Amino acid sequence: MTNNRARTEQANSALRIPSPLIAYPSAHRLQPSAQQHAWLTRPGSLTEALKALGTFSLTIMCEGKFAACPHDAVLLGVEERTPLWVRDVALCVNDTPYVYAHSISPYEATEPLAAWSTLRYRGHEPLGTLLYNDTGIQRSAFSWQAVECPDGMQHVNPAIKNGAPLWARHSCFMRLKQPLVIAETFLTAFWQHPSPQC
């Protein structure tokens, strides 16, 4: 009985997180403008690019161990409900959310001495300081799409008007054969900046 209870507790220890913004594709067939496409495919650290637009800050929206939702399971190539380490943050410029970043990796890959062990201890430090200073990390090409902001998540995009679609991108970082997928959704306020030049 004790062993059964322990297995049940272990299975339930990874809570289910709501699907990320990028899991809500727009019903409209849209093509990004030249400026939008430049940002959606921009290499290098997005954090550094945002710092050029004003005073940068990071707000942690959600972080911890969760069970993979269907969308995240597909992105990582794992079974649904596989334990993941999830980190959702708002990247802000002048205290306004500009980008919503959703980072996921298999939980076992974030354990001590594993490929992404330092993910659990980033705090308010952007991931970019880790990802672009390690020559052992490889990044995939970007995939991008227009997405809708569901009612339950509009608090992360207060500048939205008339339910206008948002643009999002994602890519996969590999280290020691372990994946870290980062999905970045550009919020409405980002495009309202006087000069979000890529």
What do these predicted ranges mean?
Residues M1-V86, A90-C92, T96-C198:
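N-terminal domain-onset segments
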